[in-house]
């Protein structure tokens, strides 16, 4: 519980308080537009298609990351006194050509497990794995290029833009993509633990 509360407080400080300070600074500096990088996580565990024009419809925001991302976007929507644009990328991963990334989180946590499997099992060995939920991962260069393009479009202030891959992958599919890249065995039998 102590670790959970510490992480919750850190996310609150970074996502909500940090956004509030940035919005206030942009207003005081007379910025022409506030560009907020949010996340598709603002939808929480919404079932179905969460469109760019949706916000209040978010569901099941119990997880600290979902909740703080949602609240930080709310700060922009309610307290920003200058024009703004909101960008909601999927889970950001490394550069599409080089793989380079400057932080390890999200899907990267599974890499160590896949490396361990690769080191003890032959590549031809079929594995059983979990396959729950859909993931949307986008390379960092795709996100940067999309934001650069959208930030320079005329007449889009107040807009919200999803920066996602139109081809979603299940957890099992994603793990197999990573396993193939690591020359590790694949998860040929996958089950949903629910």
Label each PLM-derived region with a short phrase.
Residues 8, 13, 17-64, 84-85:
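Conserved Rossmann-fold NAD(P)-dependent oxidoreductase catalytic core, especially the SDR/UDP-sugar
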Residues 12-16, 61-70, 104, 133-137:
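Short-chain dehydrogenase/reductase
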Residues 16-22, 68-76, 110, 143:
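Conserved catalytic Lys-bearing alpha helix of Rossmann-like short-chain dehydrogenase/reductases
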Residues 25, 59-90, 95:
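Active-site Tyr-X1-5-Lys
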Residues 92-97, 127-134, 161-169, 178-180:
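Glycine-rich Rossmann NAD(P)(H)-binding loop
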Residues 146-194:
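Mid/C-terminal beta-alpha module of Rossmann-like enzyme folds, strongest
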